[in-house]
């Protein structure tokens, strides 16, 4: 085995881990929804879509055996994580500033009309308001945790893209 193969194998293992982390985060969201009765708002559902996209791209990238394919999927992961950062930051700003709204009247029908909301309504149907502040976990609101998660994923994937940029030429 050469360094190229070892690096690709290590990268694929990390991508598998990222995929499983996304599954765990989505399972945590379902736990909060069904056990703690914390209904998801439109921005919560959009964040779930971003975590799903990151997980799917991570699992697909873990199955690819060349750097170019891994690079393309890691780029898609970075784009999804950046979208998640923006959505979570907006959600957090709404919760930190009472009186603001996420535009439930306009956002809810759009989110609920997406195909996954029809296929998996228990996971992707809007049931709450963005202004509803649920009890913080370790002093941080839920959108804050999502923001931290998306930011960590974004930084890690961008660092990986930067670190392995020379392997694309090979």
Curated annotation (Swiss-Prot):
It comes from the Bacteria. Disulfide bonds join 41-44, 102-130. Residues 32-49, 90-144 are periplasmic. The chain crosses the membrane at residues 15-31, 50-64, 72-89, 145-163. Residues 1-14, 65-71, 164-170 are cytoplasmic. GO terms for cellular component: plasma membrane. GO terms for biological process: protein folding. The keyword Transport applies. It is a multi-pass membrane protein. It is found in: Cell inner membrane. One of its GO terms (molecular function) is protein-disulfide reductase activity. Keywords: Cell inner membrane, Cell membrane, Chaperone, Disulfide bond, Electron transport, Membrane, Oxidoreductase, Redox-active center, Transmembrane, Transmembrane helix, Transport. Belongs to the DsbB family. Required for disulfide bond formation in some periplasmic proteins. Acts by oxidizing the DsbA protein. HAMAP family: DsbB (MF_00286). NCBIfam families: PRK02110.1 (NF002552). This is Disulfide bond formation protein B.
């Amino acid at each position: 085995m050469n360094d190229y193969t070892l690096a690709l194998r290590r990268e694929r293992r990390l991508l598998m881990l990222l995929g499983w982390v996304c599954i765990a985060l989505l399972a945590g969201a379902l736990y909060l929804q069904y056990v703690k009765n914390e209904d998801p708002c439109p921005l919560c559902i959009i964040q779930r879509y971003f975590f799903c996209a990151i997980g799917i791209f991570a699992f697909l990238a873990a199955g690819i055996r060349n750097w170019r394919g891994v690079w393309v999927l890691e780029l898609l992961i970075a784009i999804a994580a950046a979208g998640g950062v923006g959505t979570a930051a907006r959600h957090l700003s709404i919760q930190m500033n009472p009186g603001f709204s996420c535009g439930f009247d306009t956002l809810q029908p759009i989110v609920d009309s997406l195909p996954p909301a029809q296929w998996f309504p228990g996971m992707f149907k809007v049931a709450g308001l963005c202004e509803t502040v649920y009890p913080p976990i370790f002093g941080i609101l839920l959108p804050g945790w999502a923001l931290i998660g998306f930011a960590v994923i974004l930084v890690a994937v961008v660092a990986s893209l930067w670190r392995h940029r020379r392997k694309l030429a090979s």
